[in-house]
């Protein structure tokens, strides 16, 4: 199968958590380790899933109990960050169909990148473990690169790939990803196997383009996006 309308797309940039990788188990373990270490009640996977999408500082801020002081929050966040960077690959895995999709795009000559609100060290580890030799660029949160929906991380990846926003497709799983793509001037596809409920997304972005399986990306007419 050939990628449709290949000439209109030079690059595909993916979100990481909830799009390429199912990271919820490792994130939940790190959040709950940090909470328990500091004597706070732990959260369910469902609660943690609902907190995702705006970076790890926001994730931890949502997870701590109401009334937590700023200094206590910083201590909990520091514990989370240290634990997660050390344990971010224990249960994380690609979603079904992701590896065949990425290999197909690579074989078809499409340049690929990752843009994530995850800290750069964890993004680098996961990129190297799962996508080395397949995906060319991986941009995470670091000094000078603000979190999505600020488009700078996506624009940085696009520039590093030698593409332009007009010739890039961005693929994500959340309202944050849709907003990021629109701010950057990219075409966007939103996946429905990730961390957001389909009804939630469609009610807020009825005009967005959605897919249920990775292989659907290969059958899209990119000119209609």
Model regions: which residues?
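An amphipathic alpha-helix signature
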Residues: 28, 32, 45, 49, ...
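Short, acidic loop-to-helix structural element flanking the phosphoryl-transfer center
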Residues: 86-114, 120-126, 151
């Amino acid at each position: 199968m050939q990628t449709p309308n290949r000439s209109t797309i030079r690059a595909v940039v993916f979100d990481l958590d909830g799009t390429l990788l199912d990271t919820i188990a490792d994130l939940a373990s790190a959040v709950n380790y940090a909470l328990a270490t500091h004597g706070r009640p732990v959260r369910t996977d469902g609660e943690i899933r609902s907190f995702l999408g705006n970076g790890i500082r926001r994730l931890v801020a949502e997870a701590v109990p109401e009334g937590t002081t700023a200094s206590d929050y910083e201590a909990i966040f520091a514990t989370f960050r240290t634990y997660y960077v050390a344990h971010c690959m224990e249960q994380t895995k690609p979603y079904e169909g992701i590896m065949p999709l990425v290999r197909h795009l690579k074989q078809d000559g499409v340049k690929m990148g990752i843009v994530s609100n995850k800290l750069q060290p964890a993004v680098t580890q996961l990129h190297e473990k799962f996508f080395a030799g397949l995906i060319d660029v991986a941009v995470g949160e670091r000094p000078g690169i603000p979190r999505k929906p600020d488009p700078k991380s996506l624009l940085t990846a696009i520039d590093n790939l030698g593409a332009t926003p007009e010739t890039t497709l961005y693929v994500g799983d959340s309202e944050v990803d849709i907003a990021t793509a629109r701010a950057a001037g990219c075409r966007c596809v939103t996946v429905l196997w990730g961390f957001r409920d389909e009804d939630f997304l469609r009610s807020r972005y009825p005009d967005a383009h959605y897919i249920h399986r990775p292989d659907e990306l290969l059958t899209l007419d990119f000119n209609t996006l």
